[in-house]
From Swiss-Prot:
Its main location: plastid. It is an enzyme of class 1 (oxidoreductase). Residues 1-46 form a transit peptide. Keywords: Chloroplast, Iron, Metal-binding, Oxidoreductase, Plastid, Repeat, Thylakoid, Transit peptide. Heterodimer with FSD3. Interacts with MRL7 and PRDA1. This is Superoxide dismutase [Fe] 2, chloroplastic. SUPFAM superfamilies: Fe,Mn superoxide dismutase (SOD), C-terminal domain (SSF54719), Fe,Mn superoxide dismutase (SOD), N-terminal domain (SSF46609). The keyword ATP-binding does not apply. It catalyses: 2 superoxide + 2 H(+) = H2O2 + O2. It comes from Arabidopsis thaliana.
Length: 305
């Protein structure tokens, strides 16, 4: 089990509307300014500024995943559940310090070291669902290629072994939640909460199970793939046959091209952050300085061995 979270306090962050998380050389989660707002926008209506997260449609027609995922499922899952998360989030953050932030920033700040603020569930579910829709495609499935396949074979033994472990994790994720393939480029684990610059062996693919709305962003992993194991994701098509839904998802729907693109971005991000950290590590962290550690979270998150 893994209990991790960001160290910064919400009171110091909510008044800095353009802050993004970055693993800096001072061995803890830092926050840096970024002038671009990703995912979230503000919309002017009749001269009044309102929170304006929009319900982004899946990148394909709603019937394009048939017969593996029905139009009816997407009508309910995207058109009702996902939509409700976005609408509720906009209501929750309107007029607060959070309504100037991107969706990812709202997720990270409202997680609040595991003591989630009211906006967290809707923000994370909105983010998770958008990521989920973009993880699948008509005619998906098959087998990845290139660097993604190489890392899967390195970290799991074989693609077939990865499939079995991912399916098992998703099937055994009790209740509502998500199962993820993520790129881990830090040293957060149960035995070592210290987070210095990662060594090469720390950079690896991991399978993670999270409950409810929690996702790997909150402890600074890079999500690559997710499957929604809330019942509303599959019940219309598969009833209580979760294992059949998981098999169909992995064999007929996964967009390995998208996962590969995400991996490229995750690796580039890790390299950039390591370079930035190396440049200032000696200055900010003399050898005799005691490294800071992450605080424990109240939320249990499972990383699959």
């Amino acid at each position: 089990m893994m209990n991790v979270a960001v160290t910064a306090t919400p009171s110091s962050l909510l008044y800095s509307p353009l802050l993004l998380p970055s693993q800096g050389p001072n061995r803890r989660m830092q926050w840096k300014r970024n002038g671009k707002r990703r995912l979230g926008t503000k919309v002017a209506v009749s001269g009044v500024i309102t929170a304006g997260f929009e319900l982004k449609p899946p990148p394909y027609p709603l019937d394009a995943l048939e017969p593996h995922m029905s139009r009816e499922t997407l009508d309910y899952h995207w058109g009702k559940h996902h939509k409700t998360y976005v609408e509720n989030l906009n209501k929750q953050i309107l007029g607060t310090d959070l309504d100037a932030l991107s969706l990812e920033e709202v997720v990270l700040l409202s997680y609040n070291k595991g003591n989630m603020l009211p906006a967290f569930n809707n923000a994370a579910q909105a983010w998770n669902h958008e990521f989920f829709w973009e993880s699948i495609q008509p005619g998906g499935g098959g087998k990845p290629t290139g660097e993604l396949l190489r890392l899967i074979e390195r970290d799991f033994g074989s693609f077939e072994e990865f499939l079995e472990r991912f399916k098992s994790a998703a099937a055994s994720n009790f209740g509502s939640g998500w199962t993820w393939l993520a790129y881990k480029a830090n040293r957060l684990d149960v035995a070592n909460a210290v987070n210095p610059l990662p060594k090469e062996e720390d950079k690896k693919l991991v399978i993670v199970k999270t409950p409810n709305a929690v996702n790997p962003l909150v402890w600074d992993y890079s999500p690559l793939l997710t499957i929604d194991t809330w019942e509303h994701a599959y019940y219309l098509d598969f009833e209580n046959r979760r294992a059949e839904y998981i098999n169909t998802f992995m064999e007929k729907l996964v967009s390995w091209e998208t996962v590969s693109t995400r991996l490229e971005s995750a690796i580039a991000r890790a390299v950039q952050r390591e370079q930035e950290g190396t440049e200032t590590e000696d200055e900010e962290n003399p050898d005799d300085e005691v490294p800071e550690v992450y605080l424990d979270s109240d939320i249990d998150v499972s990383e699959v061995d």
